[in-house]
Structure formats: structure tokens, C-alpha cells
């Protein structure tokens, strides 16, 4: 299946869920940091594609990349668990970018979050 289609489906579903929970701003910050981690550490993507790592190990890696030592938000952790259980971790960077784009369009904010 096309990377863009899959990524946008997950991003749209996440955006709807985030709005229903009132967590879109928190998720935006977490995804900005995750995007920054993907750009700063290209090996992060390779690690997530490693079949030897368990879902739990990958989830820990993703959460650390997104929030550091702080605990990840409930919505973020639930979404990442879904992505990992569905074996879509190879799409994660694209899902991340799609979500950030949807958020900015929804909030009419075109400036980038720079943590």
C-alpha cells in the first residue's frame, strides 16, 4: 500500500481522536519532538525497523525520542502501541509529518514548533 495513503489515514484518525480527547496540543508537541529526533538521528528509523526488538522496546524508544525522560502522554502511548501492533513502524516518520501538517492546517498555524 502507498506510504502517503497509509500515513494520512493514521494521521487523520489520530487527529480525530486527539480532538475528541482535547489532547491535540500535547500530541503536537510530542510529535514535533519525535520529528526532530527522526531528523537528528537517522538511525532511529533503522532501529524501529529492526525485527529483533519487541513492541515494548520499540515503544520505549519512540517515547524517549518524543518526550525524553518525562512520561509520554496517554494518547501518544496508545497511538504508538496501535502503530506497532499493526506493524506500521516503517511508516511512523511519515505519519508524524502528516499529523503535524494536519494540526497546522486545523489550527491555521503555519509556523513550525521549535522546542
Predicted region positions:
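Elongated, mostly alpha-helical coiled-coil "stalk/stator" tethers of large membrane protein machines
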Residues: 1-115
